[in-house]
Amino acid sequence: MGDLSSLTPGGSMGLQVNRGSQSSLEGAPATAPEPHSLGILHASYSVSHRVRPWWDITSCRQQWTRQILKDVSLYVESGQIMCILGSSGSGKTTLLDAMSGRLGRAGTFLGEVYVNGRALRREQFQDCFSYVLQSDTLLSSLTVRETLHYTALLAIRRGNPGSFQKKVEAVMAELSLSHVADRLIGNYSLGGISTGERRRVSIAAQLLQDPKVMLFDEPTTGLDCMTANQIVVLLVELARRNRIVVLTIHQPRSELFQLFDKIAILSFGELIFCGTPAEMLDFFNDCGYPCPEHSNPFDFYMDLTSVDTQSKEREIETSKRVQMIESAYKKSAICHKTLKNIERMKHLKTLPMVPFKTKDSPGVFSKLGVLLRRVTRNLVRNKLAVITRLLQNLIMGLFLLFFVLRVRSNVLKGAIQDRVGLLYQFVGATPYTGMLNAVNLFPVLRAVSDQESQDGLYQKWQMMLAYALHVLPFSVVATMIFSSVCYWTLGLHPEVARFGYFSAALLAPHLIGEFLTLVLLGIVQNPNIVNSVVALLSIAGVLVGSGFLRNIQEMPIPFKIISYFTFQKYCSEILVVNEFYGLNFTCGSSNVSVTTNPMCAFTQGIQFIEKTCPGATSRFTMNFLILYSFIPALVILGIVVFKIRDHLISR
């Protein structure tokens, strides 16, 4: 290949890495730390897809199988860093998922993953591997120190507060984060730390449990060249501290070539090569493809092992070349050495223990308390979200206020009609404002819980419950602000007790709307779809259950039965009784009667109550109990849904 001096760690870019003494399982010195090994033996993964669209019933049994991984075997030891190269769709991320036990249920996995010669069981993967994904899923309104502090509280049982804080400070120092410890994480709209620093925070969160095997899915994605190089050098340093580091990478610079202990190349799920940088140069030289001088070996070998699909001729030509190289590797001494190392570790008389992460997590309620504090601190710092949450109902109420101004007692001037219209809006709009809050705020927390639950920090339902508990005081305050302004200004029933009942009756649908949205967000990934579904359910509930548009007693039996399962029925009856009971109406001048104007049929509020919802007066307390029973029912349903989500995603 020519002079490789420009590719060494001390080359032109000045990438200095302490190579240290790589721990080797073959004759390791007595003073070396405990060595560990990771082996993947004959890993294959395939998924099946329907031949035609889902609506084509005739083809429901016709499927085609796509092979994503094909007989991949790798071996790496502690103190080493392995880089996995490959074009898009080559199977790099799937291979990491296979290593970490995160493959989906939709496919079929064949092969074994060995750590220290022991085949891992499904429940052991989570406790053995730390996995840093491409995207940094962090809460933007927390500082770096707070982010790591809360992660540590979730991962490690708190003992001595001093030693606990020292752990966080030590990890920040190890990853050069101390100078930004008190800065917010931030996001695209909120200033914060840089993208490279966010990536280091994600790595630091994993280091808190002292993992011995760390996996990184394209850790340099979205970073500039210098920052990407710094991240790779950091990972090399982590590997030198008796860890196994495996990462996928996209278009690395040539200066990094000699930093990796092993380099693997995938093409369409097949392992084209896996060995040291020196072995790679010799192997491709022997295949007749020497890397040109002054070329980036990563780019050269990536192009060499990729299939060009721009034309049929080029596809055939490049496919033959890739197959030739893959066949040569399978027959090479490098491949045989990999298989031999795995088999040797499997048959040791005394197998080393599997290096699990620090596993001393706190109890369920302790984790729930930590999550509640973290969620509250993160959301309270979002000033716009807090203002929106508190004033959203009020803004809707101001529109009603300007439109109606003040209700009257004269039936001919809309005394009943205005009140019914207001109650209809109260019942229909309050669940929707709750839904808007959840759709706006919870998806970020859901993404965090999806990742952290796979890391074994907690279960997804705990994040959902923490959010639900966080919602309660904000919802109470928001409802009281709305009620205080609208109730008295609109001139509704002038009794303080009635005001209290009114506020309590509106708090329930607001919470129900938000909790119903949480349940659906546990089922449906797209928040826009959840928005539409909740809106449709709210509209349907008001139409069927409120009795404002059509008397429930006059509805067809199926709709009448459905109305009993809508919270709008009970909320509407409470509001109607609360407002109309004890009211007396006038009907124009004294000489106007029912015979001259049918609208004068209702001169007392009780008459309207008995006409629209008979017996609601005697059911007032029961309606409150039933209305508020929807809240714990939705919370329990949400826990079940998120437990199922946890099972589906984590397994």
From Swiss-Prot:
Q: What is this protein called?
A: ATP-binding cassette sub-family G member 5
Role played? ABCG5 and ABCG8 form an obligate heterodimer that mediates Mg(2+)- and ATP-dependent sterol transport across the cell membrane. Plays an essential role in the selective transport of dietary plant sterols and cholesterol in and out of the enterocytes and in the selective sterol excretion by the liver into bile. Required for normal sterol homeostasis. The heterodimer with ABCG8 has ATPase activity.
Tell me the segments the record calls region Disordered: 1-32
Its family remark reads: Belongs to the ABC transporter superfamily. ABCG family. Eye pigment precursor importer (TC 3.A.1.204) subfamily.
Name the reported effect of N437K: In STSL2; loss of normal maturation of glycan chains
Topology: which residues are Cytoplasmic? 1-383, 443-467, 522-528, 645-651
Residue ranges of the ABC transmembrane type-2 domain? 388-645
**Which keywords describe this protein according to UniProt?**
ATP-binding, Cell membrane, Disease variant, Glycoprotein, Lipid transport, Magnesium, Membrane, Metal-binding, Nucleotide-binding, Translocase, Transmembrane, Transmembrane helix, Transport
The UniProt transmembrane annotation reads 384-404, 422-442, 468-489, 501-521, 529-549, 624-644
Q: Which disease is it linked to?
A: Sitosterolemia 2: A form of sitosterolemia, an autosomal recessive metabolic disorder characterized by unregulated intestinal absorption of cholesterol, phytosterols and shellfish sterols, and decreased biliary excretion of dietary sterols into bile. Patients have hypercholesterolemia, very high levels of plant sterols in the plasma, and frequently develop tendon and tuberous xanthomas, accelerated atherosclerosis and premature coronary artery disease.
Bilayer topology term:
Multi-pass membrane protein
Explain what the record says happens when changing R389H.
In STSL2; loss of normal maturation of glycan chains
